[in-house]
From Swiss-Prot:
Protein name (database record): Glutamate synthase large subunit-like protein
InterPro entries (UniProt xref): Aldolase_TIM (IPR013785), GltB (IPR024188), GltB_archl_type (IPR043578), Glu_synthdom (IPR002932)
Keyword Oxidoreductase attributed: yes
Species annotation: Rhizobium meliloti (strain 1021) (Ensifer meliloti)
Pfam families referenced in this protein's UniProt entry, alphabetically: Glu_synthase (PF01645)
Start and end residues of each stretch annotated as Disordered: 108-133
PANTHER family documented for this protein: ARCHAEAL-TYPE GLUTAMATE SYNTHASE [NADPH]
Feature: compositional bias, Low complexity: 109-121
UniProt keyword Oxidoreductase present: yes
GO biological process: glutamate biosynthetic process
SS bonds (residue pairs): none
Coiled coil: none
Family affiliation: Belongs to the glutamate synthase family.
GO molecular function: glutamate synthase activity
């Protein structure tokens, strides 16, 4: 019989922690890989690892209540006849009808419109409610082509060609059968109740030269009026940004691994892609090397939560940001009000990510008619507008403290890093020094 010293409790493995052991047992019992929504849950270097250097003697701050700080941004100035003018540099990322309920899509449109910004469709096409309540709507053109309608291309204010997504760069999408309702099936030309797997690459091109041809096609369809965005997942941001610019993009959307998804394999979300913080500087460098920084706009997404995150992304060189998961939380996702029902689903408010199952108590990531009734799109849209207002005010507060009268005047020299990793990724000095690792390399 083995003896354990009472003063030395059994020690668990850091490699085989409780979660890892449970996952091994689950996989052994079911033979099925884990599917979930949202973005990575592992801790990665992020905007929290950066701080702003406020003005003191060497800089002149602005008065918060007397001196203005502009927040406007124009997207699509390169080729489009009708670029998009936004009041704030915070947009709503692409999330599909199907993954989200109709009321949720309407709420996103209402909130974005009230805030003077844009929202985006997603895999599966455009709904009339979304178009009707979105003053500025970006139409996603995806590899699956589900729900693609040339008439909707013309009804949109911009087109976003999706090449990749931060939560799963190199992977396609999925919408499980329980969310393929009659309406979703009709829009996507699919059988009701059958799992949908979306392609991971576009069927009519094999490389960047073909992307250029596709962009020209879309310009012809829309009479060169609409800005053309190209969205890529954060994997090789320097080269992907450069190739998107070469192909003729007006705007590059760069999505880091903290960006959410409706459903994919957990192993994909946690092990493929790069943190948002690591993606921005290489993309900006590519634009600068091509003489296109601020001429081709850069929109950054993936884990944007606050006005501080917005300000940091802009300081690193982005023109705007996009939010997805945060917007869903603002309209009611994972609300503790539904805690009892989350527990019945085997989870808790704040951790619910089984969006693919279509059982969301909040009525957001579901197609269940009874659950959808729980979400009031008018009230939810108002909450989103409030959240966007606060984010904007927070970003303005920081910009004024740094002596800037426009959010786009924020720059890397306004930042310092708390960790070596963040300093290397953001290419800003480690706090208390003028040094950062990896200068001149990506």
């Amino acid at each position: 019989m083995s003896y354990h010293n009472p003063y030395t409790p059994p020690r668990k493995s850091a490699t085989f922690d409780d979660y890892t052991l449970a996952e091994i047992r689950r996989a052994a019992a079911t033979g099925i890989y884990d599917i979930r929504g949202a973005g990575t849950k592992r801790k990665v270097p992020h905007f929290d690892d950066l701080l702003f250097l406020g003005a003191s003697i060497s800089r002149y701050p602005l008065e918060g209540y007397r001196e203005k700080c502009d927040t406007s941004v124009v997207l699509g100035t390169r080729f489009a006849k009708k670029p998009i003018h936004l009041k704030i540099p915070i947009t709503i990322a692409g999330m599909s009808f199907g993954a989200l309920s109709g009321p949720a899509k309407e709420a996103l449109g209402r909130g974005a419109t009230a805030s003077g910004t844009s929202t985006t469709t997603g895999d599966g096409g455009m709904t009339d409610e979304e178009r009707g309540h979105s003053q500025t709507l970006v139409y996603q053109y995806l590899p699956s082509r589900y729900g693609m309608n040339p008439k909707d291309l013309r009804r949109a204010d911009a087109i976003e060609v999706v090449v990749g997504q931060g939560a799963k760069p190199g992977g396609g999408g999925m919408l499980l059968g329980q969310k393929i309702s009659d309406r979703v099936a009709n829009m996507r030309n699919l059988p009701k109740g059958i799992d949908q797997r979306s392609a991971c690459r576009h069927p009519d091109w094999t490389g960047p030269d073909d992307l250029e041809i596709k962009i020209l096609e879309l310009r012809e369809i829309t009479d060169w009026e609409k800005p053309i965005y190209v969205k890529v997942g954060g994997a090789r941001p320097y080269y992907d940004t450069a190739l998107a610019v070469k192909a003729g993009a007006d705007v590059v959307v760069l999505d880091g691994m903290q960006g959410g998804t409706a459903a994919t394999q957990d192993v994909f979300i946690e092990n493929v892609g790069m943190p948002t913080l690591a993606c921005i500087r290489p993309a900006v460098q590519a634009l600068q090397d091509l003489g296109m920084h601020r001429k081709v706009q850069l929109v950054v997404s993936g884990g944007i939560r606050s006005g501080a995150d917005v300000a940091k992304a802009l300081a690193l060189g982005a023109d705007a940001v996009a939010i997805g998961t945060a917007a869903l939380v603002a309209i009611g996702d994972n609300d503790p009000h539904w805690e009892e029902e989350y527990q019945k689903l085997g989870t808790t408010a704040g951790a619910y990510d089984d969006w693919h199952e279509g059982k969301d108590p909040a009525g957001i990531t579901t197609q269940d008619p009874e659950l959808m009734k729980r979400l009031d799109p008018v009230a939810a849209g108002r909450r989103l507008a409030n959240y966007l207002k606060v984010m904007t005010l927070e970003a303005q507060t920081i910009a004024r403290a740094c002596g800037k009268n426009h959010l786009h005047n924020l720059e890397p020299e306004d930042l310092c890093a708390l960790t070596m990793e963040a300093a290397a990724m953001a290419q800003v000095p480690l706090a208390g020094t003028s040094w950062y690792p990896g200068k001149g390399t990506f």
